[in-house]
């Protein structure tokens, strides 16, 4: 009887080891596939001309491409496989399943040429595996004076410019390793008497590979049908125009990979790499890093490069170049506040400062 029990136990152990080896092989294969995709894509860029610049200016709602919060911006926006808080609503809806508590966030950026950008979001756990969230994005300026050929300093009349996006998000943890999420958002762009409206969708996935802390994500953002402005405008000849060309939304495909090469009780270093494929510009690679001390203080760094450019030196074909930032976690009794700052260099266009405040409740 004892021998039979030992035999059964050995068979079960061997079966478990085979399953573990099979799972490891699958995970390694996925990792190799991801790495191969980056390598092949970068290699092809040396052989095939980069025509991404010819796609510039073909899509609408450009404000949706502006990073939402300071943490993500400081890491070069290479965060689709990193996010674990309410900012996931913007970067990767599936990342909401990594958050351990409900959270609210507000972020402000002094954008270029006196433009202001705001992002606000909140999340709520229906249960351990199901999370919902809402978000609001705004890009706006002060009223601008109307100028003409004969009155270049202004006519005395003003017009308004502003963009908004209001979204609802749902994320679900399917297994301990795989999660997905989606955001449906109403988007409106207003310039003087013209306005453009659309309903767009974000879809994201998050997969823990089982190899240490390795994980990767696939995200499709701003997916929807073509749109055209409504309203009227006066052209240079003084004619009133009411019919306009349609434009596609700024759809973006993102593939990201992240892991922790250094993780101890008081120290953690996260490294991430991300490939972006926009429909209106050249493919680009983002690299990001975050150092955490004692789960209280954070330092971040990020780099963006168009496919084919060297990671060293100044970016040649993109305005956005280097970014960095810092953050601090402040315990406040029953809640926790996260304050983050980001500095982004846009070379000739200038510098953008962002600050974010997130509160856990």
Regions found by a protein language model. Give the residues of each.
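Intrinsically disordered, low-complexity N-terminal regions enriched in serine/proline/glycine
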Residues: 18, 26-27, 34, 40-41, ...
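A general marker of short, structured functional hotspots
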Residues: 23, 31-34, 57-59, 166
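Subset of outer-membrane beta-barrel
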Residues: 46-361
């Amino acid at each position: 009887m004892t021998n039979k029990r030992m035999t059964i136990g050995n068979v079960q152990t061997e079966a478990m080891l085979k399953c573990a080896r099979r799972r490891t092989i699958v995970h390694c294969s996925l990792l190799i596939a991801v790495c191969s995709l980056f390598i092949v894509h970068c290699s092809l860029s040396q052989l095939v001309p980069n025509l991404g610049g010819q796609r510039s200016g073909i899509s609408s709602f450009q404000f949706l491409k502006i990073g939402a919060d300071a943490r993500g911006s400081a890491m070069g926006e290479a965060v689709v496989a990193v996010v674990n808080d309410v900012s996931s609503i913007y970067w990767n809806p599936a990342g909401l399943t990594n958050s351990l508590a409900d959270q609210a966030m507000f972020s402000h950026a002094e954008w270029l040429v006196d433009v202001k950008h705001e992002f606000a979001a909140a999340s709520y756990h229906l249960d351990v595996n199901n999370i919902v969230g809402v978000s609001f994005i705004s890009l706006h300026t002060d009223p601008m004076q109307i100028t003409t050929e004969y009155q270049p300093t202004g006519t005395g009349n003003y017009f308004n410019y502003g963009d908004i996006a209001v979204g609802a998000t749902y994320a679900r943890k399917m297994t301990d390793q795989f999660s997905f999420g989606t955001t449906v958002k109403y988007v409106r762009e207003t310039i003087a008497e013209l306005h453009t409206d659309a309903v767009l969708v974000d879809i994201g996935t998050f997969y823990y590979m089982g190899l240490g802390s390795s994980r990767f994500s696939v995200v499709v953002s701003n997916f929807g049908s073509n749109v055209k402005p409504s309203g009227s405008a006066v052209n240079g000849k003084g004619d009133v125009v009411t019919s306009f060309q349609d434009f596609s939304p700024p759809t973006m495909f993102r593939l990201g990979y992240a892991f922790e090469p250094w993780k101890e009780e008081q120290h953690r270093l996260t490294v991430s790499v991300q490939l972006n494929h926009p429909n209106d510009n050249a493919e680009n690679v983002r690299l990001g890093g975050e150092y955490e001390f004692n789960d209280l203080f954070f330092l971040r760094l990020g780099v963006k490069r168009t496919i084919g450019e060297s990671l060293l030196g100044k970016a040649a074909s993109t305005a956005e170049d280097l970014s960095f930032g810092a953050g601090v976690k402040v315990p406040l009794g029953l809640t926790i506040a996260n304050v983050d700052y980001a500095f982004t260099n846009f070379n000739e266009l200038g510098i953008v400062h962002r600050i974010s405040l997130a509160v856990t409740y």
